[in-house]
Every structure is written in structure tokens, then in C-alpha cells.
């Protein structure tokens, strides 16, 4: 597993200089976008390959984010940090029927990501201990796959500024299977155009996924 690093950078020397000044001390700096994804391909691949739908979603999220430079920066405290790696977080039901948190390092190699996902989530479920990759820029996710929800807003503790995506049950239609997702991001990290590009690329990655 590759060792990732993070370092503090000068916001004034980045493309986020103005956003840093404008949003770092805002009482609510988080923005939420909603999007309906066509996940018919993921459902089909999951059934045919045995790969978990949630793992495929997490990989697609990481793949879409990995080509957008804003995902390698994150405001932490009162600083702007630069990362050289991305991870995707997933929530795991542990052996005590409680939830634990598991960061999975992103790899463009789907098979490798799947191996890490299965290994790490199994360990977290067994140990009931979170697996945190503090040196990676972590994209949070939460899959409430048994429930009909449209998304969530206002998830801001004032401590964690990480981007976060949540979804519920997918809907099977006559011609396609859809999934409504909500994507929350810190306005210092990215603008709306970057977030919209990310969501479009997520759909593109889903559409062209091959196993």
C-alpha cells in the first residue's frame, strides 16, 4: 500500500486564494449539490461479477475525483493542506451491530481497490476499530441502501471539512436504474463548477466501467 503524504501550502500561491479568504471563517462554508445518476451499469456489473455495489460506487467516486486537482487540497483548521493521494471512506456495520469508519486508499486499478476494500472493511467489522488514512484527502460516503432518501444537507461539525456523498436505495425503472446522491463540499476547497464537473465525471466513469 502506497504511503501518502500531506503538507501545508500557502493559499495565496494557489488557485484557491480568494476562496480561502472568503470562506474559511464563514459560519456555514459547506455547499450541497444533488444529482440523479444512472447506475444501471453498476447494478449489472455487481450482479454478474459479485462485486459489491457500494464498492463500485466508492471506486467511481475516487476515479472521478482523482483527475480534478481541487480534490488534492483541503482546509484543515485554519490552514490549507496539499495531499498526494485520495481515499474514499465507507461506513461499516461492525460485529457489535454498531457503525465504524473505514478509509480505503484509492487505486485506479479496480481489482486492487476491490481487494483493499474487502480486506479493510472486513478488518474494521471484526475489530470494531476505525481505519483512518490521515495523510490522504478522504472523501466521505454513507450508503443508506435500505431507505428511500433524496440526500442530506447541513452536515458540518466545524471540525471536518472533507467532501461527503450520501445516497439511499436505487430505483429500478423500465429503462434505467437511478440513484439520487447528495454531494457536500467546502467552498474553500472547490467552487460549484468543480463539484458539477466531478458529478458529471462520476456518471462518465460509471458509464464506461469495464470488468
Specify the residue positions occupied by each region the protein language model found.
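Acyl-group handling in specialized metabolite and lipid biosynthesis
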Residues: 30-35, 42-48, 99-111, 190
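Acyl activation and transfer enzymes in specialized metabolism, enriched
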Residues: 42-67, 179-198
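Plant-skewed but cross-kingdom recognition/interaction modules and surfaces
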Residues: 120-128, 132, 165-166, 183-185, ...
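Intrinsically disordered, low-complexity linker/assembly segments
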Residues: 152-184, 188-190, 195-200
